[in-house]
Regions:
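Acidic, aromatic-lined catalytic clefts of primarily extracellular/periplasmic carbohydrate-active enzymes
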Residues: 1-120, 133-134, 147-186
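Primarily short, surface-exposed interaction patches in extracytoplasmic proteins
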Residues: 139-145
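Short, hydrophobic/amphipathic alpha-helical patches that form generic packing surfaces
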Residues: 123-128
């Protein structure tokens, strides 16, 4: 985190409400659209085997057990909403910390007081991982331009619209694009 400054209220209640709505709650493990075993509010159990609390299955994941094979091992396992909330918050905080280190545009947005726009990046990192977000090089460059007054926030939204993520993600992408353009939570 730059200069050890205290964090503003990130994640905000608005971001957490967005994630609940956009991810939806599933008590039982399922395969998401990419074939990844997921539970709760979009928690990727393949990326976070520590949430399994099953040492034998956690070890299998670390050795490469994925998809339907992992799902079969988890048959009958469920999460409460409280467990899902705790995992979601933990993941959001991990994403936030990674963005502070790896995404200068996130830091600039936070420092400029553009928290709704910063949380668009945090929402996207939660959805696709920090590495996935960092592939949006054109959009991140447009954010720099908007912060410097070289282009508009509408241009940043247009950058998002040109991505495969936009076409695949639908309602969520449209809401986050609008939030980036307006600076108001969608």
């Amino acid at each position: 985190m730059p200069d050890n400054k205290p964090l503003p209220n990130i994640p905000s209640p608005e971001l957490l409400a967005q994630l609940r709505d956009q991810e939806g709650f599933r008590a039982s493990p399922y395969l998401d659209t990419q074939g990844v075993v997921t539970i709760g509010y979009g928690t990727n159990l393949e990326a976070h085997p520590e949430y399994l609390n099953l040492p034998d299955v956690e070890g299998m994941v670390r050795r490469g057990l994925r998809g339907r094979l992992l799902l079969n091992e988890l048959t009958g396992r469920t999460w409460s909403r409280e467990r899902a909330e705790a995992a979601m918050l933990d993941e959001v905080v991990q994403c936030r910390e990674a963005l502070y280190v790896r995404c200068p545009q996130f830091v600039r947005l936070v420092e400029a007081g553009e928290l709704p726009r910063a949380e668009v990046l945090l929402n996207m990192a939660y959805n696709m991982g920090v590495s996935g977000l960092l592939k949006f090089k054109n959009t991140l460059s447009l954010i720099d331009g908007a912060l410097d007054g070289r282009n508009s926030w509408a241009a940043v939204e247009s950058g998002l619209k040109s991505s495969l993520w936009w076409r695949q993600t639908g309602r969520r992408a449209r809401a986050l694009g609008r939030q980036m353009r307006t600076g108001v939570y969608a």
